[in-house]
Amino acid sequence: MTLGKNKRISKGGKRGKKKTQETMSRKEWYDVVAPKNFEVRQFGKTICNKTQGTKIAADYLRGRVYESNLADLNKTQGDDDAYRKVKFVVQEVQGRNLLTQFHSMEMTSDRVYFLLRKWCTTIEAAVETKTADGYTLRLFVIAFTKKQSNQLSKNCYAKTRLVKWVRHRITNLIRQRLSKVNINEAVTLLTRNILRDRLAKRCNPIVPLRDLRIRKVKVVRTPRFDAQALLNAHGEIPASAEGEARVVEEAQEAPAAEATA
């Protein structure tokens, strides 16, 4: 029987093996910088491919969203802020620094479940307001009623008219307060609990409240990008040479161990 050629078997070329390039040698490290109203400015690092031809690294970095814990950003406020997560969006790249702006803030789910109780009324309000510099924020507020000092009943349910009154007052106070400030001042009011304490103080005379929290804040709409406003929000940017000084070494094959007799 005549044996034909096996077309699946191809002769190996005389070319040498292709040299593999270390993946990390094509990348650069950047510092993620928070606005100046936070105590810890450089809260993280990120990595991106270097600029090659028409692929500019800054175009891939703009629009990225990074999350951090509020207790890590404000060290002096203690661990009470550990249950809140803050997100920032990159708006501009300046050297190896990523200039970010506030994107959203949210309580952790376990903290929300911890606040829930039986035999009380849960009051929720969703408020949409616009800051003085054109940012549209949507806030979600949650409050819980409590017993009065001379109450004998084990439940502390609030009447519907009182719930509506509390919700109406929360809406008016938030819109009046945040419509007069810019985005950085609004974030300070939210992260420092200034607005929350003000709401609790004004709503307690209507119905006794055990707790009132701003559960979630998110930026719904943003104005046209203004580079000067972003630079004013950041002020002096702390320098960090760690990203520039980082050296990525090429991977080398380890020498084969000699066989022992």
Swiss-Prot record:
Gene Ontology CC terms? cytosolic small ribosomal subunit
A GO molecular function annotation here is: structural constituent of ribosome
Q: Which GO terms describe its biological process?
A: translation
Per the record, where are the segments of Basic residues compositional bias?
1-18
Region of interest called Disordered, as start-end residue ranges on this chain: 1-23
Entry's SMART domains?
A: Ribosomal_S3Ae
Alphabetized, the UniProt keywords read:
Cytoplasm, Ribonucleoprotein, Ribosomal protein
Q: Name one Pfam family in it.
A: Ribosomal_S3Ae
- Its predominant location is cytoplasm
Question: Where, per UniProt, does this protein localize?
Answer: Cytoplasm
Q: Which InterPro entries does the record match to this protein?
A: Ribosomal_eS1, Ribosomal_eS1_euk
Q: Which family does it belong to?
A: Belongs to the eukaryotic ribosomal protein eS1 family.
Q: How does it assemble?
A: Component of the small ribosomal subunit. Mature ribosomes consist of a small (40S) and a large (60S) subunit. The 40S subunit contains about 33 different proteins and 1 molecule of RNA (18S). The 60S subunit contains about 49 different proteins and 3 molecules of RNA (25S, 5.8S and 5S).
UniProt name for this protein: Small ribosomal subunit protein eS1A
